[in-house]
Amino acid sequence: MSLSLYDSAHSLDGKSGWDTPVFSMKDSMDRNPMVTEAWEALCQSQVYFRGKPVGTIAAYDHASEEVLNYDQVFVRDFVPSALAFLMNGEPEIVKNFLLKTLHIQGQDKMIDKFKLGDGAMPASFKVLHNPIKKTDTIIADFGESAIGRVAPVDSGFWWIILLRAYTKSTGDHSLAERPECQKGMRLILSLCLSEGFDTFPTLLCADGCSMVDRRMGIYGYPIEIQALFFMALRSALSMLKHDSEGKEFMEKIVKRLHALSFHMRSYFWLDFQQLNDIYRYKTEEYSHTAVNKFNVIPDSIPDWIFDFMPLRGGYFVGNVSPARMDFRWFALGNCIAILSSLATPEQSMAIMDLIEARWEELVGEMPLKICYPAMESHEWGIVTGCDPKNTRWSYHNGGSWPVLLWLLTAASIKTGRPQIARRAIELAEARLLKDGWPEYYDGKSGRFIGKQARKSQTWSIAGYLVAKMMMDDPTHVGMISMEEEKHMKPPLRRSSSWT
């Protein structure tokens, strides 16, 4: 990796990426030396553009000869870093990041002679520093350099969510009210609220469009995107101005939220009772009276789910589309469902019940499984295209990702179950620092450092810090959490696990 990225930190105004946050040096020495080291590593990861911090690189692995794209600032990767800085009273880097990515959004976006939508946000960007000319240049990637060449659907949603978190944390509404930020939100919303051929309120997506950025069979209506979509809509609703343009979008958002919450809570939700109902489904039903609305064939239910599903507990399945229900558990989508109140309070508690009941499967020795269970053998070959990185219990195919610790912690605090977070943090503290902050862990229980995992992975570091700070001060959860709106509450039905 070229060190020019770090040279720029010193080149223009003397600021250094090694500045240490007040929290880390003043308080964490007495609390936990691991926190101090984490803060130092997070500060080292800062990227500067013309003397100002604009993000954090994905990883700074001294031992790795191949840099690949780990020296870039990824939008989704920066979110836990941003939350850590906000919780520590350092909003400048977050503000700079939001404005810089907004500027990048306005660029022409061409991939193989095809122009992307105006609202598309980059997957990542890289700062190139010329020490001779003392100039900094930003090069953005909208998916043209990614595996599979897929544009990130989640980037725009994370941007809106982070703008709300900045506003909630600082109390500064002026940034969100800027004309360019209002326009940026509207452009993102235009992409996902446009009318088309869909009969569902969910977003149709390609494989590899989110954190699961390789072929993993999530094409269709993946839970991660739907949950982020819901949260971004609610975030935008609270920040759009009540002018003519803003009101037009607000009306669309309210209608979409109502339809989306009903759809997700009705058709994506799975618990013991609903599983039993699907098991007994009739097929080939026509007309609006159909119970099996998606014509899911009971014989397509995988064997593992019957043992996995506890009597108390439930979760949002990975995907629902015609004649297809992906029963896999995806951690990020379910945690975001809790934080955004896409899940009802009863469903939120049921998700936490499931995590407790299936701790060995979903948490094991390192929190948290990104996806469960892993695909193997013939299924792995067909679904992933024989992807050597996504072999069973590795990477996105059942790997354990420490960054998810902050999401689990936030969900635990919101549902009044902090003991779940405390237990998970203790597991992480036993290994993360000693292992050099790996990107992910492999194995059915998450025991082994991932076979291709980078060390000094920034979001593993930031995820741990955010989890610790939220446990230390649970009010921090408010910047990323939302309470349920009364108009979205559905009539409660089915699910013995909710009571």
Swiss-Prot record:
Domain of life, source organism: Eukaryota
Catalysis: reaction(s): Hydrolysis of terminal non-reducing beta-D-fructofuranoside residues in beta-D-fructofuranosides
Enzyme nomenclature, EC number: 3.2.1.26
Coiled coil: none
InterPro entries xref list: 6-hairpin_glycosidase_sf (IPR008928), 6hp_glycosidase-like_sf (IPR012341), Glyco_hydro_100 (IPR024746)
GO BP: carbohydrate metabolic process
Top-tier EC class: hydrolase
Keywords, alphabetical: Carbohydrate metabolism, Glycosidase, Hydrolase, Phosphoprotein
Phosphoserine found at: 11, 497
Record PANTHER family: ALKALINE_NEUTRAL INVERTASE F-RELATED, PTHR31916
Biological role: Invertase that cleaves sucrose into glucose and fructose.
Protein's UniProt name: Probable alkaline/neutral invertase F
UniProt organism field: Arabidopsis thaliana
Gene: INVF
